[in-house]
């Protein structure tokens, strides 16, 4: 069995994290040539490329597996050193999370862990359909995802579901939907998506109104909080988690345009196995809080 030298593997990690050889060399305080040599040593050891030399570079499938291994080793090592050394640097936890979870339940869930444990969070925001890929690539040690199946050498637990409602302000509804929400009226009503790969709005309209993807005008805004603001100010209609707009719905500032219809996204918590003690704390906190505030049926 080939056992990688972790100092050499850190060179591969640095190239991916810093998006190039030059910045990786600066990060590691070595020459660019030395970075290339270390990666070449790894590739010779495993007999295959570990890095696709694009701009920015990206790991091959084998490179992803090695980076995932490095994440696990670093987490266990840092936790052990934390037990042995006083005043050590807080443990870094890189997690991939979707923007809507971050805007609603995730931070309250992590509050007890952050208050009691010496950790530093690196929250990488990604669509819930793609967060698991960051775990697969070894960029993070945990991910909130809609994928229910665990990756090899990983664990998964169900968190619960976010229910999305199709909402807008009352003036917006009066302007664009005077006779109710119909297929023809939707074609004229501005909507919003998180990015070009966000299919939440399009999937809802296709499922319930038989509108093909791309048929509705859509703003692109990379912020869950901005969705709420855009809807409140009467700029767009959009899909927003019910958990995020309970007060606005109760006050009438926002209205549910399609009562009885919703889009449900079941969320799962993925992480490497075996779990360190710190990751077990994170897992327990997420599951306990998620089971309280997210739909479980």
Curated annotation (Swiss-Prot):
<dbReference type="GO" id="GO:0003700">
    <property type="term" value="F:DNA-binding transcription factor activity"/>
</dbReference>
<dbReference type="InterPro" id="IPR023490">
    <property type="entry name" value="ArgP_gammaproteobact"/>
</dbReference>
<feature type="DNA-binding region" description="H-T-H motif">
    <location>
        <begin position="21"/>
        <end position="40"/>
    </location>
</feature>
<dbReference type="GO" id="GO:0006355">
    <property type="term" value="P:regulation of DNA-templated transcription"/>
</dbReference>
<dbReference type="InterPro" id="IPR036390">
    <property type="entry name" value="WH_DNA-bd_sf"/>
</dbReference>
<dbReference type="Pfam" id="PF00126">
    <property type="entry name" value="HTH_1"/>
</dbReference>
<dbReference type="InterPro" id="IPR036388">
    <property type="entry name" value="WH-like_DNA-bd_sf"/>
</dbReference>
<feature type="domain" description="HTH lysR-type">
    <location>
        <begin position="4"/>
        <end position="60"/>
    </location>
</feature>
<comment type="subunit">
    <text>Homodimer.</text>
</comment>
<protein>
    <recommendedName>
        <fullName>HTH-type transcriptional regulator ArgP</fullName>
    </recommendedName>
</protein>
<dbReference type="Pfam" id="PF03466">
    <property type="entry name" value="LysR_substrate"/>
</dbReference>
<comment type="similarity">
    <text>Belongs to the LysR transcriptional regulatory family.</text>
</comment>
<keyword id="KW-0805">Transcription regulation</keyword>
<comment type="function">
    <text>Controls the transcription of genes involved in arginine and lysine metabolism.</text>
</comment>
<dbReference type="InterPro" id="IPR000847">
    <property type="entry name" value="Tscrpt_reg_HTH_LysR"/>
</dbReference>
<keyword id="KW-0238">DNA-binding</keyword>
<keyword id="KW-0804">Transcription</keyword>
<dbReference type="GO" id="GO:0003677">
    <property type="term" value="F:DNA binding"/>
</dbReference>
<dbReference type="InterPro" id="IPR005119">
    <property type="entry name" value="LysR_subst-bd"/>
</dbReference>
<dbReference type="InterPro" id="IPR017685">
    <property type="entry name" value="ArgP"/>
</dbReference>
<dbReference type="InterPro" id="IPR050176">
    <property type="entry name" value="LTTR"/>
</dbReference>
